[in-house]
């Protein structure tokens, strides 16, 4: 019988009753796979379970949930000493699963679990905001952030990622830009931004490719700004034919700094962070993550 590395699955409490997942884990255990399961109910649970994972000596901690769960587990993992840090696997169980989708993680529970347990680990970058808060996928600001944070849970549960678009169309009254200044290496822009995306990964908000050229192991952040010129016409052109829109500005840098004369909120993989000054930089190759061999986010 083949031997498999030991793993610990940290499961978001919203998915604790998933019968298909329960059956898949039972089948793995019947085939000799050692997989521990822990369920999160409140903030801080993931960090405690990773402490336990290190004590158990598991090779992989699997993030079972959406982008927020992946973010919480990745953040807790990079706080561990590199010598004892397990690799991270991904089991996409959230509403949008933006990072998992863009990374090519299988939608099938069985295939995703297999990849998370025995897939080859690649060293990936982690982004950090103001030397404190981290994200693995993307930081978004502006109209999209307000929509994502306010989309009702029942709508997300019923419709998944498309719920963000539907709720956005319902809340066009919120469509107002943020005035800010953005600096990076060989990059400077100042003006009114409708949407800002700073990507380590490529997509956010339920499938919107905000930073289509981003890679998670190239040491660079990708920036995309949707300016507010013409507002509604600009938004329509941007959504229907983004590569030809004059209202899009792109940039790349190892770091970006955003300064606003008023409070802004950025969504970091689902976690809101408010302020008037944000400095976003990269921690290169900070985490080993089990990804498909043909993962489009790897160079």
From Swiss-Prot:
Its EC number is 2.7.1.-. It holds the Pfam family YegS_C. It comes from the Bacteria. Residues 2-133 form the DAGKc domain. GO terms for cellular component: cytoplasm; plasma membrane. GO terms for biological process: phospholipid biosynthetic process. Its main location: cytoplasm. Binds 1 Mg(2+) ion per subunit. Ca(2+) may be able to substitute. Its cofactor is Mg(2+); Ca(2+). Keywords: ATP-binding, Cytoplasm, Kinase, Lipid biosynthesis, Lipid metabolism, Magnesium, Metal-binding, Nucleotide-binding, Phospholipid biosynthesis, Phospholipid metabolism, Transferase. SUPFAM superfamilies: NAD kinase/diacylglycerol kinase-like (SSF111331). It is found in: Cytoplasm. The active site is at 271 (proton acceptor). Mg(2+) binds at residues 215, 218, 220. ATP binds at residues 40, 66-72, 95. NCBIfam families: lip_kinase_YegS, PRK13054.1, YegS/Rv2252/BmrU family lipid kinase. Belongs to the diacylglycerol/lipid kinase family. YegS lipid kinase subfamily. Probably phosphorylates lipids; the in vivo substrate is unknown. This is Probable lipid kinase YegS-like.
């Amino acid at each position: 019988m083949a031997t498999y590395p030991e793993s610990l699955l940290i499961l978001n409490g919203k998915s604790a009753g998933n019968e298909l997942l329960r059956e898949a884990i039972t089948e793995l255990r019947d085939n000799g796979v050692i997989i521990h399961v822990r369920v999160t109910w409140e903030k801080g649970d993931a960090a405690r379970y990773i402490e336990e994972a290190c004590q158990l000596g598991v090779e992989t901690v699997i993030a079972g949930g959406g982008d927020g769960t992946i973010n919480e587990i990745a953040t807790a993992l990079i706080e561990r000493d590199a010598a004892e840090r397990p690799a991270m696997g991904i089991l996409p169980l959230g509403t949008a699963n933006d990072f998992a989708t863009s990374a090519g993680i299988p939608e099938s529970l069985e295939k995703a679990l297999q990849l998370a347990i025995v897939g080859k680990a690649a060293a990936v970058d982690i982004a950090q905001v103001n030397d404190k808060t981290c994200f693995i996928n993307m930081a978004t600001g502006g109209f999209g952030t307000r929509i994502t944070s306010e989309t009702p849970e029942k709508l997300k549960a019923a419709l998944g990622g498309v719920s963000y678009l539907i709720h956005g169309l319902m809340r066009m009254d919120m469509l107002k830009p943020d005035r800010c200044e953005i600096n990076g290496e060989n990059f400077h822009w100042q003006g009114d931004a409708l949407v800002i995306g700073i990507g380590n990964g490529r997509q956010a908000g339920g499938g919107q490719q905000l930073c289509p050229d981003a890679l998670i192991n190239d040491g660079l952040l990708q920036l995309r700004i949707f300016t507010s010129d013409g507002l509604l016409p600009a938004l329509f052109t941007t959504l229907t034919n983004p590569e030809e829109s004059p209202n899009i500005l792109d940039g790349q840098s190892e770091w970006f700094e955003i300064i606003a004369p008023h409070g802004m909120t950025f969504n970091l993989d689902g976690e809101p962070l408010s302020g008037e000054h944000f400095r976003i930089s990269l921690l290169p190759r900070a985490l080993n993550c089990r990804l498909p061999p043909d993962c489009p986010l790897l160079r």
